[in-house]
């Protein structure tokens, strides 16, 4: 499968140039994020905007946060944590794909995750990293 690196690079330059755009965000939010086209098995964004929903795990500053991407291709293993219905589809987070992003990549908020489910995800991330 050919990836659209050149098309994404143009989009990424535009996103990077948005010096006045810094959305306010909070942990537990699920938002659309311009993840782009990535290497190998790293989770890509989809569609014209190269986007997919992400869960904000930790805010580090106004400019950067730690996220995990969502997927509708749910697998039954310790790296996929089910979330239920998100934006009209059954979804899960992929904790093995945890990453730091610039908040310029974030846009439309979808929902705020339930505190109990978020606590389960935090625990799974801690276990992954320990």
Give the residues covered by each predicted segment.
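C-terminal terminal-subdomain/extension
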Residues: 1-10, 15, 23, 48, ...
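Loop/turn positions that initiate beta-strands
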Residues: 27-28
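Residue-level recognition of conserved beta-strand positions in structured domain cores
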Residues: 35, 69-70, 97
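Short, charged beta-turn/beta-strand-edge "cap" motif at the junction between a beta-strand
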Residues: 36-41
